[in-house]
Regions:
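Short, well-ordered amphipathic alpha-helices
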Residues: 17-26, 45-46, 74, 124-125
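Conserved Asp/Asn-Gly motif in the active-site loop of CheY-like receiver
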Residues: 36-44
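Conserved acidic segment of CheY-like receiver
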Residues: 2-23, 59
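Extreme N-terminus of proteins, especially the signal/transit-peptide cleavage junction
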Residues: 1-4, 136-138
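Conserved SAM-binding loop
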Residues: 8, 38, 88-89
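CheY-like receiver
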Residues: 47-51, 55-132
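A generic structural motif
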Residues: 27-36, 54, 84
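Conserved binding/recognition cores within well-folded domains
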Residues: 120-156
Length: 156
């Protein structure tokens, strides 16, 4: 299984700590190798993503932050890539519609409970693994025309 790269961005350290703890519990429970990087500001996250979009598979993003809000951060990320999975985590339910405007996978309301984060993380991990397997298969196999048929050949 692919190592999963996750970013957690929230301006409140207490929420970052809780989410990271839950992700670590999930990682141990399902024996999945997960690397987590944390950010306290949307601009900081966006700067890192602009340098290397492939850096993250999943981003947990607070909506209400002082420098640049989570929705604008997500819009900036979407200008660079449609592939990264974005999950909003916030105290403000009123932003839910905007969250889906940037094709977020989920919208989790604070205070975050493990069962809800586990549900969302499970969906996200399946999507990441599927995309990884699909890309790996595209790189491993080629279609070769044979007479009136096509054969799939393993090139490794």
């Amino acid at each position: 299984m692919k190592k999963i790269e996750i970013a957690v961005c929230d301006d409140e350290q207490i929420y970052i700590d809780r989410i990271v703890k839950y992700i670590e519990v999930y990682s141990e429970e399902y024996e999945i190798d997960i690397n987590i990087k944390t950010y306290n500001a949307g601009r900081e996250l966006l700067d890192d993503v602009e340098k290397d979009i492939s850096k993250f598979d999943i981003i947990f993003l607070d909506v209400e932050m002082p420098d640049i809000d989570g929705v604008d951060t997500a819009r900036g990320i979407r200008k660079i890539s449609d592939d990264v999975i974005i999950c909003f985590i916030t105290s403000f339910e009123r932003y839910a519609i905007a969250a889906y405007g940037v094709e977020a996978l989920a919208y989790v309301v604070k205070p975050v409970v493990y069962a809800e984060l586990k549900r969302v993380l499970s969906r996200a991990v399946v999507m990441v693994q599927y995309a990884f397997d699909h890309k790996e298969a595209e790189e491993r196999y080629i279609e070769v025309p044979v007479a009136k048929d096509t054969r799939i050949v393993d090139i490794r």
